[in-house]
């Protein structure tokens, strides 16, 4: 979607909220870098996503175990928001620090760097991927404090603060819903129940929390690959596909590297590649080149 000047005058958070109002459920697709953000925008997505696991694996080559820090995430946010105006939802793990001050700093920094929304979770600092076993969570009270700290710190009232709970795997469905309700009452704008295993679970969250609910439909995890239509029927407001393009990109790279190593040439895999013309179109290369040509022409005319 292309935004008008009046649209861009509104904050990223306001544009995210508008997308949420306009599209039900709102598809939010993962964009591992600025180039992928532009591709997602070109494909028509109204909201995009930066995964914490994606930052760890894609930018740092590390596992999603709480190793990356706020600066790592801000670097990738800035690169995306510098070139793409599609509103960006960001994974901030547990808030990048043990205190409310850390959560506040994270919230303010995301707004400064152009993010539209964030989700913060209730795992302990030494966190794990939400679809892995042996997760540990903080108390409900500590999670509520994280939400309150984020809400109190935001400098844009439209910036969306989402509470993610991993409690299903640790305490069961009823306790997970209880946490979600408490987070919504503390000011969370939306709820992200992680690793749900059936549609009825989403419906129970929707009925209980009275704020938008996000479904994380990640591949190779605990949650079946429900369709957008199925999730709409369960009352879900947002459908997140966090790493689909990243996984496809990685597999494509593996295939290209293996083919060139084996064949001694890229000829056999060229037809699987994005062309130079397609890349130039997606990043607006010719617009930049025309401006450069105009500058050179002005210089020669003096």
Swiss-Prot record:
- Report the induction information: By propionate.
One GO BP annotation here?
propionate catabolic process, 2-methylcitrate cycle
Protein residues bound to substrate = 51-53, 129-130, 164, 194, 216-218, 247, 276
| Record-linked InterPro entries | ICL/PEPM (IPR039556), Isocitrate_lyase_ph_CS (IPR018523), PrpB (IPR012695), Pyrv/PenolPyrv_kinase-like_dom (IPR015813), Pyrv_kinase-like_dom_sf (IPR040442)
Q: Which positions does UniProt annotate for Mg(2+) binding?
A: 91, 93
Part of which pathway? Answer: Organic acid metabolism; propanoate degradation
UniProt keyword annotations, A-Z: Lyase, Magnesium, Metal-binding
EC number annotated for this UniProt entry? 4.1.3.30
Mutant phenotype after disruption: Cells lacking this gene show an accumulation of 2-methylisocitric acid.
Instruction: Tell me which cofactor or cofactors this protein depends on.
Output: Mg(2+)
Q: Which domain of life is it from?
A: Bacteria
What would be an example GO MF term here?
magnesium ion binding
What Pfam families does its record include? PEP_mutase
What class does this enzyme belong to in the EC scheme?
Answer: lyase
Q: Which reaction does it catalyse?
A: (2S,3R)-3-hydroxybutane-1,2,3-tricarboxylate = pyruvate + succinate
Give the matching HAMAP family: PrpB
Protein's job: Involved in the catabolism of short chain fatty acids (SCFA) via the 2-methylcitrate cycle I (propionate degradation route). Catalyzes the thermodynamically favored C-C bond cleavage of (2R,3S)-2-methylisocitrate to yield pyruvate and succinate via an alpha-carboxy-carbanion intermediate.
Question: Which protein is depicted?
Answer: 2-methylisocitrate lyase
Q: Gene that codes for this?
A: prpB
